[in-house]
């Protein structure tokens, strides 16, 4: 777990001070988009691992919603705001950002509750599949296929 959190923190630091934010150009745009994609994927991976542990230990879903509200991904949402994304980034990256917000359970508590009322085996399979998908994106540094 600590490995993924460390990776997230490293990516956030690179994004915060990235030259693209101060003087956008075609040369630094590609690197910034790659970093953004890695940050989104890393955050999703970290969240899905947390969910897997919660499913295994049957922890309180409300407690998890509170955890998500104060987690690293909220910091990412504050750092990478929609105006910045639409102004500087390609539309595919903005779509990834929107998907990321939609997939964040505290935005939609009903979706979260529906997920947690699903049969245990179905939940575990879904989480394992999600974890593998996001892990692959983190390693490749690319977009979701």
Swiss-Prot record:
One Gene Ontology cellular component annotation held by this UniProt entry: virion component
Subcellular location: Virion
Highest taxon in the source lineage: Viruses
Expression triggers: Expressed in the late phase of the viral replicative cycle.
Keyword field: Late protein, Virion
Family from the record: Belongs to the asfivirus K145R family.
Protein name from the UniProt record: Uncharacterized protein K145R
Species assigned in the record: African swine fever virus (isolate Tick/Malawi/Lil 20-1/1983)
Lineage of producing organism: Viruses, Varidnaviria, Bamfordvirae, Nucleocytoviricota, Pokkesviricetes
